Amino acid sequence: MSTSPLSVVILAAGKGTRMYSDLPKVLHPLAGKPMVQHVIDSALTLGARQVHLVYGHGGDLLKAHLSGQPLNWVLQAQQLGTGHAMQQAAPDFSDDEDILMLYGDVPLISAATLQRLIAAKPQGGIGLLTVKLDDPSGYGRIVRHHDRVVGIVEHKDASEAQRRINEINTGILVANGVDLKRWLARLDNNNAQGEFYITDIIAMAHQEGRQIAAVHPERLSEVEGVNNRLQLSALERAYQQQQAQRLLLAGVMLTDPARFDLRGELVHGRDVVIDTNVIIEGKVTLGNRVHIGSGCVLKDCQIADDSVISPYTVIEGARLAQACTVGPFARLRPGACLDAEAHVGNFVEMKKAHLGRGSKAGHLSYLGDAEIGAGVNIGAGTITCNYDGANKHQTVIGDDVFVGSDSQLVAPVTVGRGATIAAGTTVTKNVGDGELVLSRVKQVQLSGWERPVKKK
């Protein structure tokens, strides 16, 4: 078992021609984040002291998307094979560290599998991740002698006998820095592809009497790469299936696990129920007995115990206290905050707005930059007019206020505790405690009036 410090090399120089995209292949998202970010996260989970990212095509885009990551950027100007890519990073290797080689387009490799691989690496030898396939066509074959790994032969260079081998190379390996640099310096491109194969170091290690330990991943999907969108979609489904199984086993009821997408992190309590076609992004926290209806999208939000989110509601950057009810077809934008037992109904939008305990906004309203007290009724069609064309302004509504339907509150404005706003009122001035305010046009009734008749 190796106790050396660890650095990681991630190969990400490929163009991804078969993706038919202007975006570098490794930046295509899986579960809401770039494929290569999944690999970086696994590397950092292992405690890597340095992560070298070998890049080529789309370097500017890669650096823009990954600007906040602790990476050592290594340019591979020409893509001449995996061995060539590692040669570009080799000057940065320390003699006393282990080097783990990963791929930016193999996104589901788990930290647990990599930890087993690192632990299995013999002193002075190589840890190699391999897998057995029913159809190994196109992959490098693992060559063994008396059950010991002695080499890897690429498919195009393999003999007929070697092509019958079903154990294949995943490309993921770990070796000590001083050994790896020596082997990389001896690589040549005398093969059918005219490339420098990293796999040639296996035979070199065997010739030196070094041991090669083969380890298998927990799941085949961990070592499956992406060359086209079909493969990417298959890995997306594999990932989502894993997440759904994990949540079900942890007590979350997913009505249909095949129709659930987790694109971030879900923290949950007991007896949570999530209906079909729900998407969770960022970090979402659901308390005990929370029910999420079909078709909801939740992003970076907190929903406390006994709350019910009805179908087709979108919640982002919001906080909901206990026993809130929201939706259907509601939208809570960043900064929305609901106190306990508050209700937001269909076609209501909130942004940077606080709705007090037991307050209700049942229908067809916009509440933006608003501070709303407890026990308030917001009538259908109420609008807080928060934008004057240049700046946003706040509306403050005290406790126990009744706002009639089709009212507009032109901010900045304050409505005092217990006030009543009559239906159809436009509030432009502050309203005192307990006051009634109404600004309707006087009703006029004309007897004997007839509608115009269309001219023929």
UniProtKB/Swiss-Prot annotation:
<feature type="region of interest" description="Pyrophosphorylase">
    <location>
        <begin position="1"/>
        <end position="229"/>
    </location>
</feature>
<dbReference type="GO" id="GO:0000287">
    <property type="term" value="F:magnesium ion binding"/>
</dbReference>
<comment type="similarity">
    <text>In the C-terminal section; belongs to the transferase hexapeptide repeat family.</text>
</comment>
<feature type="binding site">
    <location>
        <position position="105"/>
    </location>
    <ligand>
        <name>Mg(2+)</name>
    </ligand>
</feature>
<keyword id="KW-0511">Multifunctional enzyme</keyword>
<feature type="binding site">
    <location>
        <begin position="103"/>
        <end position="105"/>
    </location>
    <ligand>
        <name>UDP-N-acetyl-alpha-D-glucosamine</name>
    </ligand>
</feature>
<feature type="binding site">
    <location>
        <begin position="81"/>
        <end position="82"/>
    </location>
    <ligand>
        <name>UDP-N-acetyl-alpha-D-glucosamine</name>
    </ligand>
</feature>
<feature type="binding site">
    <location>
        <position position="25"/>
    </location>
    <ligand>
        <name>UDP-N-acetyl-alpha-D-glucosamine</name>
    </ligand>
</feature>
<dbReference type="GO" id="GO:0008360">
    <property type="term" value="P:regulation of cell shape"/>
</dbReference>
<dbReference type="InterPro" id="IPR025877">
    <property type="entry name" value="MobA-like_NTP_Trfase"/>
</dbReference>
<comment type="subunit">
    <text>Homotrimer.</text>
</comment>
<feature type="binding site">
    <location>
        <position position="227"/>
    </location>
    <ligand>
        <name>UDP-N-acetyl-alpha-D-glucosamine</name>
    </ligand>
</feature>
<keyword id="KW-0963">Cytoplasm</keyword>
<dbReference type="InterPro" id="IPR005882">
    <property type="entry name" value="Bifunctional_GlmU"/>
</dbReference>
<feature type="binding site">
    <location>
        <position position="440"/>
    </location>
    <ligand>
        <name>acetyl-CoA</name>
    </ligand>
</feature>
<comment type="pathway">
    <text>Nucleotide-sugar biosynthesis; UDP-N-acetyl-alpha-D-glucosamine biosynthesis; N-acetyl-alpha-D-glucosamine 1-phosphate from alpha-D-glucosamine 6-phosphate (route II): step 2/2.</text>
</comment>
<keyword id="KW-0573">Peptidoglycan synthesis</keyword>
<dbReference type="InterPro" id="IPR038009">
    <property type="entry name" value="GlmU_C_LbH"/>
</dbReference>
<dbReference type="InterPro" id="IPR011004">
    <property type="entry name" value="Trimer_LpxA-like_sf"/>
</dbReference>
<dbReference type="GO" id="GO:0005737">
    <property type="term" value="C:cytoplasm"/>
</dbReference>
<feature type="binding site">
    <location>
        <position position="380"/>
    </location>
    <ligand>
        <name>acetyl-CoA</name>
    </ligand>
</feature>
<feature type="binding site">
    <location>
        <position position="333"/>
    </location>
    <ligand>
        <name>UDP-N-acetyl-alpha-D-glucosamine</name>
    </ligand>
</feature>
<feature type="active site" description="Proton acceptor">
    <location>
        <position position="363"/>
    </location>
</feature>
<dbReference type="Pfam" id="PF12804">
    <property type="entry name" value="NTP_transf_3"/>
</dbReference>
<feature type="binding site">
    <location>
        <begin position="11"/>
        <end position="14"/>
    </location>
    <ligand>
        <name>UDP-N-acetyl-alpha-D-glucosamine</name>
    </ligand>
</feature>
<dbReference type="GO" id="GO:0006048">
    <property type="term" value="P:UDP-N-acetylglucosamine biosynthetic process"/>
</dbReference>
<keyword id="KW-0548">Nucleotidyltransferase</keyword>
<dbReference type="GO" id="GO:0009252">
    <property type="term" value="P:peptidoglycan biosynthetic process"/>
</dbReference>
<keyword id="KW-0133">Cell shape</keyword>
<keyword id="KW-0460">Magnesium</keyword>
<dbReference type="InterPro" id="IPR050065">
    <property type="entry name" value="GlmU-like"/>
</dbReference>
<feature type="binding site">
    <location>
        <position position="405"/>
    </location>
    <ligand>
        <name>acetyl-CoA</name>
    </ligand>
</feature>
<dbReference type="Pfam" id="PF00132">
    <property type="entry name" value="Hexapep"/>
</dbReference>
<feature type="region of interest" description="N-acetyltransferase">
    <location>
        <begin position="251"/>
        <end position="456"/>
    </location>
</feature>
<feature type="binding site">
    <location>
        <begin position="386"/>
        <end position="387"/>
    </location>
    <ligand>
        <name>acetyl-CoA</name>
    </ligand>
</feature>
<feature type="region of interest" description="Linker">
    <location>
        <begin position="230"/>
        <end position="250"/>
    </location>
</feature>
<feature type="binding site">
    <location>
        <position position="227"/>
    </location>
    <ligand>
        <name>Mg(2+)</name>
    </ligand>
</feature>
<feature type="binding site">
    <location>
        <position position="169"/>
    </location>
    <ligand>
        <name>UDP-N-acetyl-alpha-D-glucosamine</name>
    </ligand>
</feature>
<comment type="similarity">
    <text>In the N-terminal section; belongs to the N-acetylglucosamine-1-phosphate uridyltransferase family.</text>
</comment>
<keyword id="KW-0479">Metal-binding</keyword>
<dbReference type="InterPro" id="IPR001451">
    <property type="entry name" value="Hexapep"/>
</dbReference>
<comment type="pathway">
    <text>Nucleotide-sugar biosynthesis; UDP-N-acetyl-alpha-D-glucosamine biosynthesis; UDP-N-acetyl-alpha-D-glucosamine from N-acetyl-alpha-D-glucosamine 1-phosphate: step 1/1.</text>
</comment>
